[in-house]
């Protein structure tokens, strides 16, 4: 659909083989930009001081849909990290972030990566149960490993 081969391959990975989502990524450039923004935020938050994390959690929690999207994006990233820590040869979802995923995986153990993935999955479930979004975001970000 007018997409070069390299970008099509990237979109196929990011969409996880879901054609509808891949089409939305092609049609709506802001979706892809938002993903990049959230992954850049993740990278900036890992070494960030607590005050920065609290401030980010406050902003994030103001829009529940945006928060859910951010957590979903972060979950795909942390799953990639966990797979690399475990030494799995499974293809990454976030192939465009391979270098930083490898870097992070080299600094974490499997139990830490697994805990972050589990925390993100639990956060999505808790959002469905209407828990306090700000508190949820704060706990989530404070529990991330400081790298």
Each language-model region and where it sits:
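Charged, glycine-rich active-site and insertion segments that engage polyanionic ligands
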Residues: 1-73, 77-78, 84-93, 97-147
């Amino acid at each position: 659909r007018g997409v070069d081969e390299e970008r099509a391959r990237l979109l196929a990975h990011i969409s996880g083989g879901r054609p509808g989502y891949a089409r939305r990524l092609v049609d709506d450039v802001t979706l892809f930009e938002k993903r990049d923004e959230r992954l850049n935020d993740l990278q900036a938050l890992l070494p960030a001081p607590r005050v920065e994390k609290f401030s980010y959690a406050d902003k994030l929690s103001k829009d529940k849909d945006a928060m859910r999207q951010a957590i979903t994006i972060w979950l795909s990233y942390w799953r990639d990290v966990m797979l690399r820590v475990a030494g799995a040869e499974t293809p990454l979802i976030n192939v465009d972030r391979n270098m930083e995923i490898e870097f992070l995986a080299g600094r974490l153990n499997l139990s830490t990566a697994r805990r972050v993935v589990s925390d993100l999955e639990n956060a999505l479930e808790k959002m469905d149960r209407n828990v306090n979004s700000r508190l949820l975001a704060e706990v989530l970000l404070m529990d991330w490993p400081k790298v």
